[in-house]
Amino acid sequence: MILCDIGNSTAKFYNNGISKVMSIKEFQKFEPKDTVYFINVNPNFKRKLKGTLFFDLAPYFEINTLYSKELGVDRIAASCAINDGIVIDAGSAITVDMVNKNIHMGGFILPGITKYVEAYKSISSVLDVGLNSQVNLDKIPLNTRDAITYGVVNSVVLLVENIAKNRKIYITGGDGQFLSQFFKNAVYDKNLVFRSMLNVIKSKGL
C-alpha cells in the first residue's frame, strides 16, 4: 500500500515501512503503477491527482475541532494521530496544534526552518552561516552562527512551550528531528502523518 503526503516543497512516500522523499519537480513527472493514497496541500496538483490511481484521503478524516473550516488536511492528519498533547509538523512551514481529549483546540503556523535561514541570508551575506545543531539555549551566544540558531530555534521553542505547559509534544516533518532535541518533553516520529493515514484507511475499510 502506497501512501503519499504532498506538501509545498516535497512529496513524501511511505510503502511497507519504507519512506522516500521526492522533490515537487520530480513529483510533477511521477506516474503511479499502483494506487496511491494521498493527502495534499499543494494547489498545483489538483488536476494531476484526479487520475484513476490517486485516492484522496482528505474526505475520510474526521476531527472534532474548534478551528475554522480553513484547517488544512496536513494539520488534520497530524492532529488525528494523537489523543492529547501538542503536535508539531516541521516542514516548509511549522504547524503547531493542540489536541485535548481528541478535540482539536486550535494552533498556529510559523515559517519553516529553511525560511528563517533564507531570511537572514537575504539581509546580508555575513549572516549566511547556517545553523548549529549543538547550540546551547541556556547560554547567551558568543558568535554569529550560534546567535542566528538561538534566534531561530527559540522563536519556535518558546512559543510552543508557552501553550504546551506540561502536555506531551509530538514532532514530525523534515526538520522535526532537528527541532525535537531542543524540547524536554518531546517525541519525534517521522511517520506520524502516515500512521494517521493508515488508521483512516483501516477504520473506513478503504
From Swiss-Prot:
Positions annotated to bind substrate: 67, 72-75, 144
GO cellular component: cytoplasm
Active-site residues (renumbered): 74 (proton acceptor)
Pfam families (alphabetical): Pan_kinase
Record GO biological process: coenzyme A biosynthetic process
Alphabetical keyword list: ATP-binding, Coenzyme A biosynthesis, Cytoplasm, Kinase, Metal-binding, Nucleotide-binding, Potassium, Transferase
Positions contributing to K(+) binding: 89
Cofactor note: A monovalent cation. Ammonium or potassium.
Enzyme Commission identifier(s): 2.7.1.33
CDD domains in alphabetical order: ASKHA_NBD_PanK-III
Cofactor(s) of this protein: NH4(+); K(+)
Gene Ontology MF annotations: ATP binding; metal ion binding; pantothenate kinase activity
Ligand binding (ATP): 5-12, 92
Compartment(s) where it occurs, according to its Swiss-Prot or TrEMBL record: Cytoplasm
EC main group: transferase
Role played: Catalyzes the phosphorylation of pantothenate (Pan), the first step in CoA biosynthesis.
Xref: PANTHER family: TYPE III PANTOTHENATE KINASE (PTHR34265:SF1)
Family the UniProt entry places it in: Belongs to the type III pantothenate kinase family.
Assembly notes: Homodimer.
Protein name: Type III pantothenate kinase
Species per Swiss-Prot/TrEMBL record: Campylobacter hominis (strain ATCC BAA-381 / DSM 21671 / CCUG 45161 / LMG 19568 / NCTC 13146 / CH001A)
